[in-house]
Amino acid sequence: MKTMMLVLLASMTVLHGSPALAHQPPAANASSQNATAFDRRAAELVDVINGNMAFDAYFAPTFQAAVPEARFKTMTAGIVAQYGRAVAAESAHSADGHSGTLKLRFEKGVATVLLDAGGAPDERVTGLRITGFTVADDSFARVSGEIAALPGTAGFLVAEVDGDSVRPIAAAHADRQFAVGSTFKLYVLDELAAEIAAGKRRWSDVVPLSHLSFSSAATANWPKDTPVTLQTLANWMISVSDNGAADTLIHLLGRDAIEARMRAAGNSDPSRNTPFLTTVEAFALKGNNFTDLRGKFTAGDDAAQRKLIDGNADKLILGNVDGVSFTAGPRFIDSLEWFASPDDIARLMIDLRRRGSEQAMAALAINNGLGPVAAEPWSYLGYKGGSENGVLSMSLLGQRKADGKWFVVTASWNNADANVDTAVFSGLVARLLALAAK
């Protein structure tokens, strides 16, 4: 599911930063006569991360609206807990004086940071993105230990994929199913690509945007039934995890077809995803407006659940979703979600690649999840993530530049008792990807 996905990603991937004044190299020193807005804001980032500079003095109102101070502090506290305090900014570079990259050194690692400084008069930061961490003498064992220490439950798999074979390189709880949020949309993409390969549909087919949903970055406030192509829906569903696009495709393709594709792709417990819920149906059942239906749904078998969904189609709609209930913390992530194990995701990625669909692979690669630095060792890098309160999942499919081999890196973290830290988890996955690239 994706209740807070975009905001959480904004708080980590829109974390654009700058280096510390005391440690800034001469080219970006804030006192330099030729210092730019980027240089000046970069020179303050260590103090911002360490809590020594006021949040509203550094970030523009647009950033503050997307990432409130409390969330920013929670996120940076997680980074500091994992990597130590920020100590220096290095290798700061901007081509235009406003947007650029830098390395932010912590006590236990180095982060790659993308920073956008605004214009006059105050030049406050409008974008901040930490794209990954490097750690000296890193290893799969070290990352595995840190993943094991996360509160709740977590698992991961790093594997070479060759044809239909999965060759694990490093793993923990890879056969255990986790709630994976919007990662379920890979099954929708797989079925769409399969139907197009079979000649049933074309990527250029135009269909109405028949179903709207929450957390829809692309289709928010769009008129219902706006005509769009199937390729556009797929691109939106994968690259920005648009829920309206996903629900439109689920209704178009049909639950039965997607469920059959999920089974064929090797999901180890497909009953947990049967019936295959739309995002609106899941939101509605998780919320406070359908407490009676939720109890019946979670207690029922597949047939009973399908009957309940079909029989309440006129009730389980966007207008009846209680959004307020999602503000406090995790909601029924063990029983009302979409589920897959790291092994399941690896098999799904194999199934998707087997389609030979240029369009499906391109959709996966629009947003690689970890930024350009993490992607540099890969000639292809596709990504799909998922999140809601208490749930984080990140899955990548890459072809290594060095030898042309294909790899899957996938990890999931669930905590039914508390929200999970996007920045910490993304850093761990970035390290797994970097180790797989070697």
Describe each region flagged by the PLM.
Residues 23-48, 137:
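Short, low-complexity N-terminal intrinsically disordered segments enriched in polar/charged residues
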Residues 24, 132-150, 322-438:
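Structured C-terminal helix/loop/strand segments within mature extracytoplasmic catalytic/sensor domains
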Residues 43, 48, 53-96:
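Short solvent-exposed beta->alpha transition segments
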Residues 94-143, 424-433:
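Exposed beta-sheet edge and beta->alpha loop/turn motif
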Residues 131-177:
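Beta-lactamase-like hydrolase cores
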Residues 178-207, 409:
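Active-site SXXK
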Residues 198-226:
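Short, glycine/proline-biased beta-turn/loop segments that scaffold the active-site neighborhood
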Residues 225-317:
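Active-site-adjacent helix/loop patches that line small-molecule binding or acyl-intermediate pockets
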